[in-house]
Amino acid sequence: GLPVCGETCFGGRCNTPGCTCSYPICTRN
């Protein structure tokens, strides 16, 4: 949901475990 994973997902996916792409950033549920 809210916390940002410190990662962008312009490629469409996030490398950080537990993070999902909320374009253009990765967020943690």
From Swiss-Prot:
Keywords: Disulfide bond, Knottin, Plant defense
Keyword flag Disulfide bond: yes
InterPro entries linked to this entry: Cyclotide, Cyclotide_sf
A matching Pfam family: Cyclotide
Post-translational modification: This is a cyclic peptide.
GO biological process, one term: defense response
Disulfide bonds: 5-19, 9-21, 14-26
Record location of the Cyclopeptide (Gly-Asn) cross-link: 1-29
Family recorded in the similarity comment: Belongs to the cyclotide family. Moebius subfamily.
Entry remark concerning the domains of this protein: The presence of a 'disulfide through disulfide knot' structurally defines this protein as a knottin.
Stated role: Probably participates in a plant defense mechanism. Has moderate levels of cytotoxic activity, active against a human lymphoma cell line with an IC(50) of >30 uM.
Protein name: Cyclotide vibi-D
Species whose genome carries this gene: Viola biflora (Yellow wood violet)
